[in-house]
Amino acid sequence: MLLRLLRTHLRPYTGLLVCVLVLQFAQVMASLYLPTLNADIIDKGVATGDSGYIWRMGAFMLGVSLAQGVCSVAATYLAARAAMSMGRDLRGEVFDRVSGFSEREISAFGAGSLITRNTNDVQQVQMLVMMSATMLVTAPVMAVGGIVMAVTRAPGLSWLIGVSVPVLLVAVGLIVGRMLPLFRSYQDKLDAINRVMREQLTGIRVIRAFVREEAETERFGDANTDIARVGERVGQLFVLLFPLVMLVLDVTIVGVIWFGGHQVGDGDVEVGTLIAFMSYLMQILMGIVMASFMTIMIPRAAVCAERISEVLATSPTITSSPDAVDTFPTPGTVEMRDVTFVYPDADARVLAEVSFTVQPGTTTAIVGSTASGKSTVVRLLARLLEASSGQVLIGGTDVREADPEALWAQMGLVPQQPFLFAGTVASNLRLGREEATDDELWEALEVAQAKDFVSKMDGGLEAPIAQGGTNVSGGQRQRLAIARALVRRPDILIFDDSFSALDVSTDARLREAMGPATVGITKVIVAQRVSTIVEADQILVLDGGHLVGSGTHTELLATCAVYREIVTSQLGAEAAA
């Protein structure tokens, strides 16, 4: 999964990566050459007192060092550029895929997990690319090249390499093997703590209202402790790795000095050669350390790549047909034909063979008890959900055959829980239509009964709005959402219980003002208060997912027992008579 992801997303940066590999190879070759130069200066210059040779070779050695530094800096810069660009592309692709998800896919992953996958997980893969680009050539060439150079210059000491390298490889392998299963556990724990944190921030009012602060603190503490334990275990193993490497290195160097010193005394090895051998030994062990570091990063990045690929491989249940149309023969009409809807992995039908037609420019209200399917109808009309069977038609076109952008342009939806984005009043209203003028915004605010409080806010239309609209009241937030839908001037307006946060007088004024402002616009209203929809051209009554009544207020009082029961419970027996 990791290789497939990298192969796909690094292809545009092949040129950069080739340059990185060439520069890294040059840098390593220079690094391997430096100990030999140093040995020659000692053996042929210092030992013989030839200062001219020392100056000449010293200057050459300085030039090689400068070239090594330039290659290293350039390789690191290009590697970082390739890795950051790949990370940007990957985040964009994940975001584009998630943006097309329906409520079903988002619920399946969880919002917190999707955020983690597009931030932390991408960062881990990005870091692997950067480290691999700088170490992929360096580690093996340095280790193998160091062995060749060391054996060539001091064959009598090469047995020390044969002892130290296997010991180091076994030790590193044992530690890394213990770390692998911990990485997936850590990512799962990270998802869990992000989910808890997000729920607590989103539901802070509910938590306080039910005095659940202590319980939620304990819940977060448990999640925090879980991730801390896994992280602590990873840290313990990681911390153990480097002292172990240094121990092997130090013991080996002591051995080199001990046995090499005897060989120098016997005249078998020159002093410069012994120093070069120690330098090569350090390079060999550093190559192994870099390789071991990569073996630590690769499993964690592999887990992250798998989680990212899982998102990218998930196909949205709501997709656009290749032959999608953007024309609607009868603008403003809304129709359902024998629509049934069942949530995935559920047995009960939320809607069962529901059929109705809404004529252009008319007002249709939808009423029913809790869990009768009212909001599901709204989501199906806006194609936020896909019908299990039957047809949903907007403007005479099946929503499954319509281009999503063109479909959504036909309607303005005011959800049950309106959401405002961080910005200003104007920027939120212009989400519906960017080219709307200030006069049009004020006109929509006046109809939505929001002009008074917006004009009193500092800045008016430019007054700041916090994320989620948390700096305005629930009723104000709902009125701004209604104004936003009005600014759009769609063929169809859908209100999903959008007046519930308004008091009776404000509700009445808004409906009175909305009448002339929405002439010719089809309105579908999910309502709880029967008194507010008695003038509707058509009222649909849902009960347990079935359409049990359809008609005007007067007709339903005479023909629909469920509607009479609703009216009686809200307005009294006299109103239902």
Language-model features: where?
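Pre-NBD coupling/linker segments of ABC/ABC-like ATPases
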Residues: P316-P329
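Transmembrane helices of ABC transporter permease
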Residues: P12, L16-M29, M131-Y186, W258-V269
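An intracellular "coupling" helix at the cytosolic face of ABC transporter transmembrane type-1 domains
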Residues: P12-G15, G100-R104, N120-V129, A133, ...
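Membrane-integrated ABC transporters
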Residues: M1-L34, V46-M61, A75-A79, A83, ...
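Helix-loop-helix
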Residues: G49-Y53, M149-P166, V172, V176, ...
